[in-house]
Each structure stands twice: as C-alpha cells, then as structure tokens.
Amino acid sequence: YDHAGLASWMTERFGVPLYMSLGEFLMMRMLGSQTRSVPQPEEQHFYARSGMPQDRVERVFEALRQDPFVPPRQDQFRRLRAGDVLTIGPRRWQVLIGEGHSPEHVCLYSAEDRLLIGGDQLLPRITSNVMVTAFEPEGNPLTLWFESLDRLETCAEGTLVLPSHQNVFRGVHARVGQLREHHQQQFEQLRHLVAERGRCTAFEAMLGLYPRLRGPEQDLLALGETVAHLSWLRQRGVLDCQLEADGIIRYNVVQSAIDEEMHW
C-alpha cells in the first residue's frame, strides 16, 4: 500500500535498484500473491474467533475486494539491515529498524545533521496502527513496537523528524513518551472493560475502545489494534483467554490483576 505501492514505478522510471529490509520485501510479496476475490480461510477463522457478527465481517471482506491495491512487480531487492550506513549525496544515513506497525520498517537517521526519516514509525499527532493480523493471530506486535520506541530514543534531542504523514516535527523523546502513555491508557481501559464484562470477546472489547467506528475499513484496523492490546495483556499475565464451544475466544481478567495497581 502506501509503504511500497510505487516501488515498481520508481525503479522502472529511474532505473534504480530497490533497497528494502527482508521482512518488508517478503510481506510485500505475500500480500501481492493473495487473491481478494475470496476470503482466505485464516481470515475467516480470525474474524469468527473475534466474535464480530457475520454481516459486519462480510462488509470488511467486501471492502477488501474493492481495494484498488496493485502489488509491486518486484522479484529482486538489495537488503537493508539494522546498523547499515548509506551514503546519499553529502549525508550518511544509519538504518534503524522499527517493528510492530510493519515487520521491518526502515528508518534512516543522519546523526551529523540530526535528521530522521521516520516513515510510519514516528508520527507527530496520530498513532501508528499496531495490529494483530489473520496470518499471525498469536503475534504480540506491541512488544516489538515498544522495543522500537527504545531504539528511536537513541536519536539526539532536537532531531528533525520527517514522517510519512502530517508535518515535520522536533521532539523525538517527548513524542515517544506520549505514545507510551497512549498505549498505557488503552491497557488500563481494556483491563477495566474486561473486568466489568466478566467474559469478553475481542469484538466487544473493540467496541469499548473504539465506540465511534465508521465503516468496514475502520473495523478492520480497530479489531487488529484491539487484539494486539489484548495479546500484550495476556503476555503480561493480566488476562487469560479460552476458545469456547461456539468457536469464539473470550477473555477474562486474571483474579490477581483485578484490583492490583498496574505498572505498565
């Protein structure tokens, strides 16, 4: 999509090679190989286990079928890894790898000029989408996301960030702190919501976290985000879950975590 949708056009138009991390290249190839005419079995299972009503699931699948995404035609690439240094014109750029939002999101940092091409990994006002997906339903992307924020904090104070959405900004450390606080608030909100309901599906938790969703595209993103937060709380021992006889996963707060003050 907006990560690599123009890769083929740029490489063909300018006669240049594609530089990319391995994880992003493989993800691009995998998404490009999937057909959108029929939902994949793993997608059907993912939504069924979430408890989302079937008519709402069908609207999500229909939105995916209508998606105009055309996968890049890329069979070769040059691999970027964390710590690599690229010399582009007068500047040297260090490769920083971010995870959570995308498998191996490449950021470029020029320490000498205090410049960070942050992409989707660090945005000035909105928060990057961090979600569990149907092809990795047991994933815990928020743990990877927080580790990536730690790496971004190594950038010097006063670094100018060039994000992929909205305006350029300064204040890497302050923004990282805001993002951590945002997710901490969501963890606390989810813990109380699940405790109040007793047994809670991911869909019910989604409606509690995001009560004003508009359309199937937002349902898709919000459900993935909700499951990511539920998975993180499971890893921390705050929640447990069970696949019940109706094929739906339901979450409970672990008894010892009901009234405990949490330190995220």
Q: Which functions belong to the PLM regions below?
A:
Residues 4, 145, 226:
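Aromatic/hydrophobic pocket-lining residues that form the small-molecule binding cavity
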Residues 82-85, 105, 238:
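Short, acidic/polar N-cap/turn motifs at the starts of alpha helices
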